Amino acid sequence: MSTISSVTISELLDAGIHYGHKASRWNPKMAPYIYGKRDDVHIINLDYTASQIDVVSKVIYKEIKEKNGRILFVDTRRHRDIVAQYAENCGQYYVTHRWLGGMLTNWVTVSKAINKLDQLEKKLADPEKIAGYTKREILSMQRMRDNLQRSFGGIRNMGGKPTLLIVMDINKDHIAVKEARREKIPIIAIVDTNSDPDLVDYPIPGNDDAIRSIRLYCKIFSDAVLLAIEHMLAASGVDLGAINDDSPSERLKAAKKITKMKPSKKVTKINVGQDQNKLEKDNKDL
C-alpha cells in the first residue's frame, strides 16, 4: 500500500521555492528560515521547508483518514485555476475568486447564498419554470447565478465549515486567516519572507508567488488527501483494483459512500441581496 512520500530538496529547487522577496520587504520573524541573500533577495533554507512539508502532509492525511475532515484551499490571486483544479481533483473545497468577509464567521448567510445558487440553477435548467419570464429577467437570473457560482461554487458542497484551511498567501488573504483564527480552525500556509509565521498553525517557509511553486504545493497537498482516501477505501474492504487509478473522482465517490458525508441543511425563503450585503459588511468590520 502506498505511503506518504517525502519531498526532495531537488524538487523544491526546481520549483523555485527557495526564492524569497527583496530583503527590504522582509518580516524579521522569518529570520530563522532564511539561508542568506543573493542580489538583495532573501534565499529560504529549504531544509526547513522540506521538514515542514513532511509534517503538513501527515496533518492533511490524518485530517481526512481519521477525522473525515473538510479542507478548504484559499488563493484569490492569479494562481486560482491551479489551486481550484487540485482541490477538485482530491474532492476538497476552494475559494479562489474573492474572500467575502463572513465566509467562516457568518456561515448561516453563506448557506443561504449556496441554497439560492442551487435554486437558480434548477429554475434556469427547467424550460417550464422560466417560460413566464422575459429575456431581461432571465438574463438577470443568469448573472446572479454566475456571481454566486464565482463566490460560492468551490464550497457549495462542503456541508459546513472547514476543519482545516490551506492558504497560499496569508498577506493577500489575510481576512481568511483572521476568520479561521477566530473560529479556531487550524491553518496551513505558505509563508514567504515578507510574512508572519506566527499567524498560522503550520507555516511552510517558501516562495508564495511562482506558479511552479504553487503547483508543487498543491500537488503535495492533493496527494496526501488522495492517499488518505485510498487507505480509507482499503480499510473498508473496497477492491481498489476495480477502481480506475486514473480517475480520482471514482475513488472520491466510493469514499463518500463509506463515510456517509452529510450535506448541509437547506434554508428557504431567503433574500440573497441582503445576504451579500451582510458578507460585505463583515468584510469591512474585519
Residue ranges and their predicted role:
Residues M1-S6, E230-L286:
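Intrinsically disordered, compositionally biased charged tails
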Residues K129-V167, N171-I188, D192:
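Extended, charged alpha-helical interaction scaffolds
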Residues I175-A234, V238:
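Short glycine/threonine-rich loop/turn motifs
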Residues A84-M141:
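Long, charge-dense
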Residues K62, Q85-Y86, K178-E179:
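Hydrophobic/aromatic ligand-binding patch that stacks against planar heteroaromatic rings
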Residues G16, F73, L165, Y217:
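Residue-level signature of catalytic and energy-coupling elements of molecular machines
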Residues I17, Y48, T76-H79, Q92, ...:
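Short, ordered loop/turn segments at secondary-structure junctions
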Residues M1-G69, D75, H79:
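N-terminal, positively charged regions that mediate nucleic acid binding
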